[in-house]
């Protein structure tokens, strides 16, 4: 699951209500809706779900994004523990920083040259599982 809303970075006291709602709906609520829908399909085919973590929780200005992303990953961890014996497998990976649109929104003007290739990072994550 890689769908995410990257709300504008802002101090917690300045988080816009619309951005907060959108962050909760996309980053957390959608995950809670998708899991019951896809679990039977994944279990029937011995499938797996992949979640992508982001280590920005607790950093200044990342409040809306980090709070909802952390909640999403917590839900995924619970699901992984619940299905460890029965399936589906639930994987959580922390990709290396990559030159994505989300990262560009958070770090405009960043030198993107040293960032990991999305193709290489995808291969790395998929090879682990």
What are these regions (language model features)?
Residues 15, 23-24:
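A hydrophobic alpha-helix adjacent to the NAD(P)-binding/active-site core of NAD(P)-dependent oxidoreductases
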């Amino acid at each position: 699951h890689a769908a995410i809303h990257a709300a504008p970075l802002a101090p917690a006291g300045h988080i816009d209500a619309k951005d907060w709602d959108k962050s909760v709906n996309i980053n957390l609520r959608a995950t809670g809706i998708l899991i019951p829908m896809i679990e039977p399909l994944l279990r029937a085919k011995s499938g797996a779900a992949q979640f992508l973590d982001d280590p920005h929780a607790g950093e200044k200005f990342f409040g809306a994004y980090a709070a909802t992303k952390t909640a999403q990953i917590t839900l995924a961890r619970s699901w992984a523990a619940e299905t460890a014996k029965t399936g589906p497998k639930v994987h959580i990976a922390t990709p290396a920083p990559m030159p994505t649109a989300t990262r560009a929104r958070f770090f405009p003007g960043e030198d993107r040259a040293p960032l990991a290739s999305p193709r290489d990072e995808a291969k790395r994550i998929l090879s682990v599982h």
